[in-house]
Amino acid sequence: MFTIVKRRELNPTVTELCIHAPLIAKKAKAGQFIIVRAKEDSERIPLTIAGFDREAGTVSIIFQVVGAGTMQLNSLKEGEAVHDFVGPLGKATEIEGLKNVCVVGGGVGCAIALPIAQALHEQGTKVTGIVGFRNKDLVILEDEFRACCDEFIIMTDDGSYGEKGVVTAPLEKKIVEGANFDEVITIGPLIMMKFVVKTTKPHNVKTVVSMTPILVDGTGMCGGCRLTVGGQTKFACVDGPDFDGFEVDFDEAMHRGTMYKPFEAHAREAECNLLKQEVQ
């Protein structure tokens, strides 16, 4: 039984679930992911581990409600259990030996960036955090980031909180001013990561991107998560999810990411209709 021991709404569309999964908590590392299934007939959802407590035996996941699967997951309450919770999967983010790192997160991708920033902080690395959101209402995990970052910058598209603009603006400024980052680690929408790489590459600042494309089985068998990295086919679930940002074909990844949008919309509509029937 993978029981939900705590539930927290981070903003109107983003939820955090803390789930009792002692075996996963024992092995989990920052950057790895799990595959969760809310109910027996639910779709398999890959979610990067947002936190873990080895002593309590719990693992935290953070997700945005966007489709039928996440709607079903979001319907579960404290004390209820998810049907499947498999992991940890993928390779952990490599942070050993890093002295000065900039972690750049966007939207719900900040949930993935946070445990990496925390792990860096715990090993004594200087951490600069830059996160971006569309507006103030969508800001998440601010206190947690401030606790583990030596410097922390919030950007919003409309300027309703923090500084107005996109994450690449302060990143470019820091690099030009001589921040001397050993590495930039970025997690968020594909378009954001693409432009982070466009910002860092001219300065030859190593940039690691966390790729979470279509994932089904999580073991490399289905091939749904394939990416082109350095001209070669890679599988995010077993070769990643972290890759050298300079080598990733973002245009291909973005095209593949839109392939199932009509099916997702249909599934979401069907789930909404079922929920309406239950209410009636």
For the regions a protein language model found, what residue spans apply to each?
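Local cysteine-cluster metal-coordination motifs and their immediate loop/turn environment
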Residues: I112, L190-I191, T212-D242, A270-K276
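Short, surface-exposed secondary-structure boundary micro-motifs
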Residues: K39, G87-P88, G230
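FNR/FR-type flavoprotein reductase catalytic core
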Residues: A68-V216
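Short, Lys/Arg- and Gly-enriched loop/turn segments at beta-strand edges
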Residues: S42-G51, L89-K99, C237
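Ferredoxin-reductase
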Residues: M1-E80
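A generic structural signal for residues embedded in beta-strands
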Residues: V36, D84-F85, L227
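Short Fe-S-cluster ligation motifs
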Residues: F235-D239, F243-Q280
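Structural signal for conserved beta-strand scaffold positions within catalytic alpha/beta enzyme cores
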Residues: K6, G51, I154-T156, V209, ...
